[in-house]
Amino acid sequence: MTPPDNTKRPNELHILQARLLQLQRDREELQRLLNSRSWKLTAPLRRFTEWGRKVWPAHQAKEQTSMLPRGGIARHALYWKQATPCAPLLGQGNEIHLWTAQQGNAFFHEISQLLKCGLEDAGIPCKAFSASSMEDCLQQDDAKAAIRLIIAPHEFYHFIPEAEYWPLNRASLWMLNSEQAHTPWFAAALVHLRKADLVLDMDHSMAEQLQAQGILALHIPLLYSPSCRLFDGDLPIAAVPATEALPLQIRQWPCLSSPLSEALSQRPIDCCFFGTASERRSHFFASNAALFAGLDAYLRLESRNMPLQYGKNSSLSTQAVCSIIRRSKVSLNIHQSVHPYFEWHRIVLQGIWHGTVVISEPCTDAWPFRPDEDYIAASLEDMPTVLEYVLRSADGMRWAEKVRQHAWDTLTANSLAHRWKTIISLYAVRYTPR
């Protein structure tokens, strides 16, 4: 008879203790509120308010949105121009802790590393953690966080559901949303976003939509960090099954020190695309197969029903992807669906960062990057013609050179550290203890 496995029991007890502690705190807070004098005095007003909510739901929604930060603070948060000194962190600790689910999409681990570099550039103490279970969270958490930042909550709480009961130890709870409003992943994330003290969103329009729903949200564009080496593509392209079709001279093509050091026309790959397969994308590439057959193109559409994990369901790594883009003249951006969106990862981190010119479908607003100044905007129908013009005409290549130079200047002139300082300062101004 096999003896019972008691190795996990202490960890299960830790989780139960955390849940009980949180429930006890909630109960004490509720009891304090029910016994307060203000609660008893406002009982008639609450009854009247409940009646009003039943007969006038539209007015209720208006009341909720009227309290949102739509004034100067929010507007300054979304479009800041002057330098803002960084306020001290709030909470018991003095660090920002960034958390991702280990089983989650590789993109979110990359974003976590970029955000961490931006914080370090700003002189803000921080740590990045990746956990696969509640046991991992409890083992790694050192209770020194003033802010706990959950990246991609739709994934984090899916893989670690017990984290909903994870005590904050007086830290503020922040979340980074990356999902578009029309996706089921956003619906899954919204439940958790409502519990956050602050939500950061890479998309400006999504930050505004969250504010309209009564959620304190700020825009955090994925900007430049000079200390982040994760996206360097200077190394030769790794020889893996996904790249074995590339000639050796392309894989080992030497890169100069700066992405703009060599002329765009000298790069050996004409265009590239990396993305998840969708009916829309597949139809575009199939319809233009003759065009791409005549180009030195690297196109990779992957079908997955699980998060992208390099080395598991993809043989490409971050470095391999960046090395291919670093050797490409054009990086294409095609939306997965008909809903427009600014794909920060593909356009900025995998495009502009490597000195390639990005040709993209029209996107949502994404300060500081502007269409036809920092990337070439073209409809799906016009994209083949624009691509041919850039690659096969001298005027088109000069235009592309001008756009990529402007994009590089925009990228390097706007630091992620500056944005972090602004966010911390704005949150400190708005913060009120709960």
Regions found by a protein language model. Name each.
Residues 296-311:
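Glycosyltransferase donor-sugar binding loop
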Residues 80-85, 95-215, 229:
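Extended catalytic core of nucleotide-activated donor transferases of GT-like folds
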Residues 78-97, 137-141, 255-266, 322:
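Short boundary motifs at domain starts and secondary-structure transition points
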Residues 103-105, 133-135, 153-157, 178-182, ...:
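Short, solvent-exposed loop/turn segments at secondary-structure junctions
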Residues 104, 164-287, 293, 415:
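Catalytic core of nucleotide-activated saccharide and alditol-phosphate transferases
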Residues 12-15, 41-47, 104-115, 280-284, ...:
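Conserved alpha-helical elements of sugar-nucleotide-dependent glycosyltransferases
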Residues 1-77:
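Boundary detector for helix-to-coil junctions that initiate low-complexity/charged tails
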Residues 90-104, 109-131, 187, 204, ...:
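Catalytic binding pocket for nucleotide-activated donors in carbohydrate/polymer assembly enzymes
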